[in-house]
Every structure is written in C-alpha cells, then in structure tokens.
C-alpha cells in the first residue's frame, strides 16, 4: 500500500502486518483483499495504469520482501464464508500443518471445485437452457445464469457446499 492509504492509530498497515507475521507459524489471508488485493488492487482509473492505492495481496507483499515469507493460506471471499475460516484454523490446530492448497494457495477442501460443478442449475446448463433476463420465464424456472454473467465455471468457492446464513442460501439459489 502507498503511504497514507492504510493506517490504524497512526501505524502503517505494512508495519502492523509485519508485527503480526513476525511470530506467526503460518499466515492466513482472510478475504478477497488480503488474498488477492480485491477491488482496490483491480481498480485502475486509466488503461495501463496501476491502482492509485498501491493495494497488494499478502502474497504480493511476501514476494516483494515487504513482509516476512511464511506458509500462506488464502481464504478469499467478500465476505469469506465463516465455516471456511474456522475449518482452516481447526485443520491447522488438529494437524499442525496447513491443509492441501491449490495453485492460488487456497485450501483444496473448500476451493477445489468450481461453483459450476455443484450448482443446482448445472443440469439446465447441460440441457442448454439459460435465463436471458433476471425476470424471464427461464429465470423463474431456475435455468442456468451463464448468459447473464455467471462466472461459476471459473469461480472456485465453497458456497455451493456450505452456503451462507447457516446453510440457508447463496447467490445461485436466490437467482444471482
């Protein structure tokens, strides 16, 4: 982060992170911003320019030598799923090691499959039945949302397994 963009009680965010990481056995980057830089990293006012905030993920900071390198587990999401966060912590406490990770340093147990693989609308995808607007007959029948911008075939998350609000729902169930 650039100076002045992230501070708490007068202390720079990088200094706070360095202090926390110094004695850590491993680091868990929780949330989209910590895991991958989130929207602050993605935002760029002009094509080809960098983020005005200088936002970086914890992994970026470790690779740049701005934070000590430790075993890193990314738990992305905005918001991340609480059961995933606690599952990673419990796994470490029970086993004394990080769980198996994918190429993006996410726990395979929770991020190994695509959202598309477990989507309740997947059969409609296979049958080539798609909603074309959020209020058409296809949407009301629960057809696949791929043509409306769904990124399920490329998204890895545990939302289809765990869901939010004690298993009550998640985006595909509510038509998003």
Where are these regions (language model features)?
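Iron-sulfur-associated redox domains of electron-transfer enzymes in respiratory
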Residues: 1-163, 169-171
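Short, intrinsically disordered, charge-balanced linker/junction segments flanking boundaries
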Residues: 173-176
């Amino acid at each position: 982060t650039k100076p002045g963009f992230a501070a708490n009680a007068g202390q720079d965010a990088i200094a706070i992170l360095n202090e926390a990481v110094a004695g850590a056995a491993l680091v868990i980057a929780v949330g989209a911003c910590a895991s991958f830089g989130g929207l602050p990293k993605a935002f760029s006012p002009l094509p080809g320019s960098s983020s005005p905030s200088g936002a970086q993920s914890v992994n970026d900071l470790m690779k740049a030598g701005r934070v000590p390198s430790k075993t890193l587990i990314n738990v992305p999401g905005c918001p991340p799923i609480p059961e995933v966060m606690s599952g990673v912590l419990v796994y470490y406490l029970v086993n004394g090691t990080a769980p198996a990770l994918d190429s993006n340093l996410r726990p395979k147990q929770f991020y190994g499959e695509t959202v598309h693989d477990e989507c309740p609308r997947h059969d409609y995808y296979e049958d080539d039945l798609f909603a074309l607007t959020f209020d058409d007959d296809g949407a009301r029948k629960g057809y696949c949302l791929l043509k409306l911008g769904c990124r399920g075939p490329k998204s890895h998350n545990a939302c289809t397994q765990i869901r939010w609000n004690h298993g009550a729902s998640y985006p595909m169930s509510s038509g998003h």
